[in-house]
Regions:
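Extended aliphatic helical segments
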Residues: 14-17, 32, 43, 47, ...
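Long amphipathic alpha-helical segments
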Residues: 33-101
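Surface-exposed beta-strand edges and their flanking turn/coil or helix-capping segments
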Residues: 16-23, 55-58, 133
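Basic, glycine-/proline-tolerant helical and adjacent loop/strand elements
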Residues: 1-50
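C-terminal, charged low-complexity interaction regions
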Residues: 74-147
Length: 147
């Protein structure tokens, strides 16, 4: 299986605010809270591709304050393995773009040392993205070329 990862640095709603105006209440590589915008948890969105490929998008879920706090409290604990998160995709994922932005998503931890994986959705398109195989050229051609 060939694998490739693409990570979004920030959730789209945070990235849309000019850097000098962003007020991050707290955050890091996996958890971010932005004053007046919301709380976000980094998750992995796996996409199966033709030819035995897989791509994982390091994307963000917009979550409630309660969900963010619960996640933060369990992040480095043994109970992290039992963590399930509900939220909404906070990035436009290529090639589907804004059609996935705001899609309801459920994520679950697979391994103690990994980010939670998106495992389900009530959104029809996101459910298809998770369950179907996609032409690898259509997806990988949307990735930025490494310089």
């Amino acid at each position: 299986m060939h694998e490739r990862d693409l990570r979004f640095k920030l959730p789209d709603p945070v990235f849309a605010v000019p850097e000098q105006q962003r007020e991050l209440s707290w955050g890091g590589d996996a958890l971010v809270a932005a004053r007046g915008i919301g709380q976000f948890i980094r998750v992995l969105l796996p996409v199966r591709l033709s030819g035995g490929y897989e791509v994982r998008y390091g994307t963000w879920l917009s979550v409630s304050e309660k969900e963010a706090r619960r996640t933060w409290e369990t992040w480095d604990q043994a109970s992290y393995l039992d963590l399930e998160i509900s939220g909404f995709l906070a990035n436009a994922i290529p090639p589907w773009g804004k059609a996935l932005l705001g899609a309801q998503a459920r994520a679950r931890v697979r391994k103690q040392d990994e980010l939670p994986y998106v495992v389900g959705s009530s959104n029809e398109l996101l459910a298809r993205v998770l369950s179907e195989e996609w032409p690898h050229e259509d997806v990988l051609d949307t990735f930025p070329n490494p310089a």
